[in-house]
Swiss-Prot record:
Annotated organism of origin: Mycobacteroides abscessus (strain ATCC 19977 / DSM 44196 / CCUG 20993 / CIP 104536 / JCM 13569 / NCTC 13031 / TMC 1543 / L948) (Mycobacterium abscessus)
Entry's cofactor comment: A monovalent cation. Ammonium or potassium.
Protein keywords: ATP-binding, Coenzyme A biosynthesis, Cytoplasm, Kinase, Metal-binding, Nucleotide-binding, Potassium, Transferase
Designated name of the protein: Type III pantothenate kinase
Subunit structure: Homodimer.
Family statement drawn from the similarity comment of this UniProt entry: Belongs to the type III pantothenate kinase family.
GO cellular component, one term: cytoplasm
UniProt cross-references to Pfam families, sorted A to Z: Pan_kinase
Pathway(s) this gene product operates in, as recorded in its UniProt entry: Cofactor biosynthesis; coenzyme A biosynthesis; CoA from (R)-pantothenate: step 1/5
Enzyme Commission number(s) of this protein: 2.7.1.33
Cellular compartment(s): Cytoplasm
Cofactor(s) named in the record: NH4(+); K(+)
Residues binding K(+), per UniProt: 131
UniProt xrefs under InterPro entries: ATPase_NBD, Type_III_PanK
Length: 271
């Protein structure tokens, strides 16, 4: 059983993955709040409390963190608590198999890399990957499996919360689909701006990518979405082809399997 850990700015997703290769499947997953000041000990206790007896069946761990402080503590947790379990922490220098054709590859977030890797592996085509997280990332991977870059916009919840925090007349609202695009009260107006506004943002960015990047206007390009708020926004979009709930966890599994295969190959070569 592989434990996949995806730490983002506001929330962390953990998943247990059974099987390998084409037979791999996320059998259980959790979503918890990210605590930027968490220690290695607290992180280990939290994870152990979630996975329970499954900790005895772990065959490996794959993890990423877009929060530097948590990334540091994860290294300590691995060394202290799981030193006997094979681990892959996605950071610069780790082999992913995805060439990064950008100005500074070290700037590309690990979450964006594994999402594009998983999408290309899953569909075998050029892909536009939309991740609805604390930021909305629209990333582009070529038919050859090359990361070409992307666009980043503020996320739905972050934008809604910021509007409420910076305006005396607005308050934090539940993000649900309103009755109409034309709201009849302040809450509905904010919900309309969030749901329909971000649907338009995603459609606009995807359409621009298709128009501006050679070869992406064709029918063979797959537009795939993931992320916690995707199910809220996707019904109002017209450009997204597929929704993959566990795309990031699948990408973590792929990187883990590739790095473990490399390590086994090197071990055999030295015998």
């Amino acid at each position: 059983m592989l434990l996949a850990i995806d730490v983002r700015n506001t929330h962390t997703v953990l998943g247990l993955v059974s099987g390998t290769g084409e037979h791999a499947k996320v059998v259980q997953h959790w979503r918890i709040r990210t605590e930027a000041e968490i220690t290695a000990d607290e992180l280990a206790l939290t994870i152990d409390g979630l996975i329970g007896d499954d900790s005895e069946t772990l065959t490996g761990v794959a993890a990423l963190s877009t929060v530097p402080s948590v990334l540091h503590e994860m290294r300590g947790m691995f060394d202290q608590y799981w030193s006997s379990v094979p681990q892959v922490l996605i950071e610069p220098g780790v082999r992913t198999g995805l060439p990064l054709l950008v100005d500074n590859p070290k700037e590309v977030g690990a979450d964006r890399i594994v999402n594009c890797l998983a999408a290309h592996h899953r569909f075998g085509s050029a892909c536009i990957v939309v991740d609805f997280g604390s930021s909305i990332c629209v990333d582009v991977v070529s038919a050859k499996g090359e990361f070409l870059g992307g666009a980043i916009a503020p996320g739905v919840q972050v934008s809604s919360d910021a509007a409420a925090a910076r305006s005396a007349a607005l308050r934090r609202v539940e993000l649900t689909r309103p009755r109409s695009v034309v709201g009849k009260n302040t809450v509905e107006c904010m919900q309309s701006g969030a749901v329909f506004g971000f649907a338009g943002l995603v459609d606009g960015l995807v359409e621009r990518v298709r128009r501006d990047i050679d070869g992406f206007g064709a029918a063979g390009v797959t537009v795939v979405a993931t992320g916690h708020t995707a199910p809220l926004i996707l019904p109002e979009t017209h450009t997204v082809d597929r929704y993959e709930e566990h795309l990031t966890l699948d990408g973590l599994r792929l990187v883990y399997e590739r790095n473990r295969a490399d390590q086994r190959g090197k071990a055999r070569a030295t015998r």
